[in-house]
């Protein structure tokens, strides 16, 4: 549960509670599918059953809140990563002025200066040296992603 923020946990608790109408402390696998689909998760029935059986630690056939959160977290985190990748791809596209599939290290320096104006020229050169492993003077999208993801 560490990987979810308070807002996400609260939303999951509300969804769980609204489907646990008898306050029994668990929801059925069918309900899990409904909740995930309401959250915008696209999952086949087969994949849903596989994920539920992996998560249903006590083998009860139902999911307690903690199990439900563990299951939902997999999808929420995955979606966050996909959204981040899409945003980074768009940022890369904007800076790839020639549409060549790469940005120059000079453009990268501009980006880094915009992100942190306290970076010295030495700092920038050090960063460039680290991320431009092949010394080409350019970064393709994968190199850019590696740098942005730390």
Swiss-Prot record:
<feature type="binding site">
    <location>
        <position position="138"/>
    </location>
    <ligand>
        <name>Ca(2+) 2</name>
    </ligand>
</feature>
<dbReference type="InterPro" id="IPR002048">
    <property type="entry name" value="EF_hand_dom"/>
</dbReference>
<feature type="binding site">
    <location>
        <position position="136"/>
    </location>
    <ligand>
        <name>Ca(2+) 2</name>
    </ligand>
</feature>
<feature type="modified residue" description="N-acetylmethionine">
    <location>
        <position position="1"/>
    </location>
</feature>
<feature type="domain" description="EF-hand 2">
    <location>
        <begin position="43"/>
        <end position="78"/>
    </location>
</feature>
<feature type="binding site">
    <location>
        <position position="134"/>
    </location>
    <ligand>
        <name>Ca(2+) 2</name>
    </ligand>
</feature>
<feature type="binding site">
    <location>
        <position position="62"/>
    </location>
    <ligand>
        <name>Ca(2+) 1</name>
    </ligand>
</feature>
<feature type="domain" description="EF-hand 4">
    <location>
        <begin position="119"/>
        <end position="150"/>
    </location>
</feature>
<keyword id="KW-0677">Repeat</keyword>
<dbReference type="InterPro" id="IPR018247">
    <property type="entry name" value="EF_Hand_1_Ca_BS"/>
</dbReference>
<keyword id="KW-0106">Calcium</keyword>
<comment type="similarity">
    <text>Belongs to the troponin C family.</text>
</comment>
<keyword id="KW-0514">Muscle protein</keyword>
<keyword id="KW-0007">Acetylation</keyword>
<feature type="binding site">
    <location>
        <position position="60"/>
    </location>
    <ligand>
        <name>Ca(2+) 1</name>
    </ligand>
</feature>
<protein>
    <recommendedName>
        <fullName>Troponin C, isoform 2B</fullName>
    </recommendedName>
</protein>
<feature type="binding site">
    <location>
        <position position="143"/>
    </location>
    <ligand>
        <name>Ca(2+) 2</name>
    </ligand>
</feature>
<dbReference type="GO" id="GO:0005509">
    <property type="term" value="F:calcium ion binding"/>
</dbReference>
<dbReference type="InterPro" id="IPR050230">
    <property type="entry name" value="CALM/Myosin/TropC-like"/>
</dbReference>
<feature type="binding site">
    <location>
        <position position="67"/>
    </location>
    <ligand>
        <name>Ca(2+) 1</name>
    </ligand>
</feature>
<dbReference type="GO" id="GO:0016460">
    <property type="term" value="C:myosin II complex"/>
</dbReference>
<dbReference type="InterPro" id="IPR011992">
    <property type="entry name" value="EF-hand-dom_pair"/>
</dbReference>
<feature type="binding site">
    <location>
        <position position="132"/>
    </location>
    <ligand>
        <name>Ca(2+) 2</name>
    </ligand>
</feature>
<feature type="binding site">
    <location>
        <position position="56"/>
    </location>
    <ligand>
        <name>Ca(2+) 1</name>
    </ligand>
</feature>
<feature type="binding site">
    <location>
        <position position="58"/>
    </location>
    <ligand>
        <name>Ca(2+) 1</name>
    </ligand>
</feature>
<feature type="domain" description="EF-hand 3">
    <location>
        <begin position="83"/>
        <end position="118"/>
    </location>
</feature>
<keyword id="KW-0479">Metal-binding</keyword>
<feature type="domain" description="EF-hand 1">
    <location>
        <begin position="7"/>
        <end position="42"/>
    </location>
</feature>
<dbReference type="Pfam" id="PF13499">
    <property type="entry name" value="EF-hand_7"/>
</dbReference>
<comment type="function">
    <text>Troponin is the central regulatory protein of striated muscle contraction. Tn consists of three components: Tn-I which is the inhibitor of actomyosin ATPase, Tn-T which contains the binding site for tropomyosin and Tn-C. The binding of calcium to Tn-C abolishes the inhibitory action of Tn on actin filaments.</text>
</comment>
